[in-house]
Every structure is written in C-alpha cells, then in structure tokens.
Amino acid sequence: PITGFKAGGTGIPLLKKLKEKEPFYASVYKHNIIKNNGNIKINKYTLGIELEVGYKIDKKFFNFKKKISKNDINKIILKIFPCIEVVGYRQKKKGIKSFGDLSSDFGGNIKFVIGTEKKLNNINVNNLKTVIYNKKANQSVKGNTNTVYKNPKNSLFFVLKKLQKSKIKFNNNFYVFTGSTVGVVPILKKGSYIGKIDKLGIVKANIN
C-alpha cells in the first residue's frame, strides 16, 4: 500500500539544467519505509544516498473542500523528522535528460530511513545546516535545507497541491519527503551513513 509521497528534482540548479518548471512527485510504498538505524541492501543500480526533511501529514487533509493554502499547512503537519533516502533504478540508465527519465523509473529500489519524529513547534526549516557522513569511508558532505525548492515546506506545499489536483484520497496519515538537502551523495563504502539536520536531529542507515 501507498504510505506517502516524495518530491523529486527539487534542486533549483537541476530544474534549470533540465529546463523544467517544477519538480515531480512519486508514490512511496510501505515496504520501502525503514525505521531509524535500519539495514539497506544496495545493488549495482543504486545511485547514491540523500538527506532530507520529512513530514507526517494528517489524513484530514483529504477532507479539505477548498484549495490548500500555505496558511493551512501547519494545521495538518503531525510530525517533522530527518530522513535518509537511498536512490536507485530498476534498470541501468545512461544519463538523465528529463524528469520523465527520473519519474518513469522511480520507486523500484528506493528506501527511506525515518529519524525520530518531532512535533513541529514552530521549527523554521528555511535555512538549516545539514551533513551526511560515513566515518569508515572518510566521507562527509554538507548541505542546507534552503537548496530544496526554496525550502522544504515549499516542497511539501507543491506535493499537497498536486495531490489535491489529482484527487488522490485515502484514510490514513501519510508521509511527504521533500527532496535532498545534499544532492545525491555517492555511496563510497558500505557501513553506517549518519545524517544530521540542525534542530531536527540525527538519522542513521546501515548500508550493506
């Protein structure tokens, strides 16, 4: 079953490079959600690892009679959390020329590791420092939440508007993953990847 949605292609430089006007979104299935400190098997089609802001959204969103506005968003956010995403395809790609290439094959090998969920409590996600690292590989990549389609909440708003437009509905609370704050980081070595987002905390994935 579908348990959430992911915004993809949220980096402004990527949007400009591919001459796209907006990101895309894709469904996320329950079997692809893993608890913090979980294990992920990778294969030759794995592209890399990402660090992003995730939200748990109240199912009452689906009962909105009017178009959702930015003022409505805080009312339906149940939790916020750091998330590691492992990105992959079902088959080998020779490069990305459009979001069609990405979205047509998204979701095959993707896993999402969810960090500790917190209440929103007026946490401003517009400009938070982020870092993902693997000590064993001596690898560390820094980022910022402001690289995600202006900011993660704006990316969330984009996904919610698309869901309303497509008239998707179901009876459960759901996740929205807003896009990478560090780009796609190559997995140099198996072992523990730890992601940290200021104010949100730490998320850990064991790659094997």
Segments (PLM) and residue ranges:
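Short, charged beta-turn/beta-strand-edge "cap" motif at the junction between a beta-strand
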Residues: T181-V185, K199-I202
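A short, charged
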Residues: R90, I168-N172, V176
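A short beta-strand-loop-beta hairpin characteristic of the jelly-roll/cupin
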Residues: K66, K161-S166
